[in-house]
From Swiss-Prot:
Binding site for UDP-N-acetyl-alpha-D-glucosamine: R92, R121, P122, V123, D124, L125, K161, V162, S163, V164, G165, D306, I328
Job of this protein: Cell wall formation. Adds enolpyruvyl to UDP-N-acetylglucosamine.
Protein name in the entry: UDP-N-acetylglucosamine 1-carboxyvinyltransferase
Record's catalysed reaction(s): phosphoenolpyruvate + UDP-N-acetyl-alpha-D-glucosamine = UDP-N-acetyl-3-O-(1-carboxyvinyl)-alpha-D-glucosamine + phosphate
Lineage of origin: Bacteria, Pseudomonadati, Pseudomonadota, Gammaproteobacteria, Vibrionales
Length: 419
């Protein structure tokens, strides 16, 4: 099993890093390509395990998939309608295959998905949305099966709970429905906006993406087109936090400040100097005092849950007691016991973690438990005294492209090895 060996240093991380395309936009866009009867080209797709799995899944369905810089998908030849367990078990995002399959072909089935073990992420909202569009859904032998005679039908859907995943499922399925769908209490994340932009380039008629009310006028077919995936705001935030806790200075390229305004505001509150350009963000923490901040995760445009673990580490290294409250997912403080193994001070009370400050962490053997938690452990290793071994780094490979190379370019001492 692969691991990271990180040798900590008191030297600040400095330099430039190029941000990859957003996994959380690339995945739904690749699944949405199932809807297209003509070839599509998707640029700025990160090289990640989940992307590779998605491409393999599309090929299993019968699509022609090729990667030479951009990802090219021809979903015209699709003749299979089942996302099998052997692929789906590793990736929760595979549920996004269901809506496009039933919308275009009238049938689809997806094995109940896997992914990060960070609490309840039920597929009920996906299922209920497809049912409201006229699909018949059954659960059999561990598979979610969807069927419709003819086309799905447009509907007015009010989501019981704000859900990024279900918003994407319903929006994609409704593009080929007969009539107009209005989706209220929709999620507003930038990745939803990006998916809608992609679909509109193929001939969909979607308006309101990025607000809590999305309108989709159904069309009979989608054609081909080209699209570049939006930059990864979570990767951007992760590297900015890495620079902040190391008292460094970095520039993130190929990213946009409007994607992570809540994160930038908290970094400034923590004492960082932030500057932004059209496609770059810089952070300077040189000679500045890191101050603890109070964070409460919330749906976009609030503070993203995917940055919670990184800010937990920031608060542990900052002056003053920081409090972080997680409102999106349960069981998302699994990084805290691992950081405490490195000497961090923190107490978990329900959905809140209260951090105390320490002068410096100490290297230790730690275990990654989910994607974002693993990033916080790697950053902790960069600033700790001595050697840190991060185990189960397959989690980090699901969401960060070449993180060890990018950190090394900033001055970190990190290597991947297999024992």
């Amino acid at each position: 099993m692969e691991k990271f060996r990180v040798i900590g240093s008191t030297q600040p991380l400095q330099g430039e890093v190029t941000i990859s395309g957003a996994k959380n936009a690339a995945l739904p866009i690749l699944f949405a390509s199932i809807l297209a009867e003509e070839p599509v080209e998707v640029a700025n797709v990160p090289h990640l395990r989940d992307i590779d799995t998605t491409m393999e899944l599309l090929e299993r369905l019968g699509a022609k998939v090729e990667r030479n810089g951009s990802v090219h998908v021809d979903a015209g030849p699709i003749n299979q309608y089942c996302a099998p367990y052997d692929l789906v078990k590793t990736m929760r995002a595979s549920i996004w295959a269901l809506g496009p399959l039933v919308a275009r072909f009238g049938q689809g089935q997806v094995s109940l998905p896997g992914g990060c073990a960070i609490g309840a992420r039920p597929v009920d909202l996906h299922i209920h949305g497809l049912e409201q569009l006229g699909a018949t859904i059954t659960l059999e032998d561990g598979y979610v099966k969807a069927h419709v005679d003819g086309r799905l039908q447009g509907a007015h859907i009010v989501m019981d709970k704000v859900s990024v995943g279900a918003t994407i499922t319903i929006m994609c399925a409704a593009t080929l429905a007969e009539g107009t769908t209005v989706l209220d209490n929709a999620a507003r994340e930038p990745e939803i906006v990006d998916t809608a932009m992609f679909l509109n380039k193929l001939g969909a008629k979607i308006s309101g993406a990025g607000t809590d009310s999305i309108t989709i006028e159904g069309v009979e077919r989608l054609g081909g087109g080209k699209h570049a995936v939006v930059p990864d705001r979570i990767e951007t935030g992760t590297f900015l936090v890495a620079a902040a806790v190391s008292r460094g200075k970095i520039v993130c390229r190929n990213t946009h400040a409007h994607l992570l305004e809540a994160v930038l505001a908290k970094l400034e509150e923590a004492g960082a100097e932030i500057e932004c350009g059209e496609d770059w963000i810089s952070l300077d923490m040189t000679g500045r005092e890191l101050k603890a901040v109070t964070v409460r995760t919330a749906p976009h445009p609030g503070f993203p849950t995917d940055m919670q673990a990184q800010f937990t580490l920031l608060n542990m290294m900052a002056k003053g007691g920081g409090v972080i409250t997680e409102t999106i997912f349960e069981n998302r403080f699994m990084h805290v016991p691992e950081l405490k193994r490195m000497g961090a001070k923190a107490e978990i009370e329900g959905n809140t973690v209260i951090c105390g400050d320490v002068d410096r962490l100490s290297g230790a053997q730690v275990m990654a438990t989910d994607l974002r938690a693993s990033a916080s452990l790697v950053i902790a290793g960069c600033i700790a005294k001595g050697e840190t071994i991060v185990d189960r780094i397959y989690h980090i490979d699901r969401g960060y492209e070449r993180i060890e190379d990018k950190l090394s370019a900033l001055g970190a001492n990190i290597e991947r090895f297999r024992d």
